[in-house]
Amino acid sequence: MTRRARVVASGAIAVAAAGLLAAGAVHLTGSRSGGLPVVGQVIAAAQRPLAPDISGTTLTGGHLDIPSWRGHTVVLNFWGSWCVPCRKEGPVLARVARETRFLGVRFAGIDIREDPSAGLAFERKYHIPYPSISDPGDLIAVRFGAAAPAATPSTYIIDGRGRIAWAWFGATTYSQLELAVTEVAQP
């Protein structure tokens, strides 16, 4: 294989891998799993790491304090309107939020790397029924330390004791999310 052919092939592989990750067709595990015991499965209660306390200004200008929701299962989604997989995932999250409300499940978004007005337009377009904190500098993700999101979107389920019970890096599906939320909310 010529040098030019190797360069072209390497570039094509990199583009394909990036496309699969962006489309949510793969999720990251191992060392990129954020130091979590498992990604994509509900974590055993004894192995669940504490989630950081998160609060901030919502896209509508209010204040959201996630620790005030202790005792409830919380679904926390990192997203951005610029993120193509987030556009596909938004309606899924909205549907699961509506369908699990009777279980006392709370949903919140973390809108990253953009102006709040773009995030608010996204929420209106996709009828997102829950608040999102504006985080243009990605400061909230950093607070997760070793369990930081490895892709956009990333979704966490935090149990009623404030511990990370489930994580998914990339776009989640309705069946994945609904099953995990139900399992964590009804132990």
Q: Language-model segments: which ranges?
A:
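N-terminal targeting signals for export/organelle localization
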Residues: 1-53, 187
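Thiol/disulfide oxidoreductase modules built on the thioredoxin-like
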Residues: 121-129, 136-187
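Structural microenvironment flanking redox-active thiols in thiol-disulfide oxidoreductases
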Residues: 87-126, 136-143
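Short active-site neighborhood of thiol/selenol oxidoreductases, capturing the structured segment around
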Residues: 64-87, 93
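A short beta-strand-turn-helix
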Residues: 46, 53-74, 144
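Short gly/ser/thr-rich secondary-structure transition/capping motifs
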Residues: 36-38, 55-61, 138
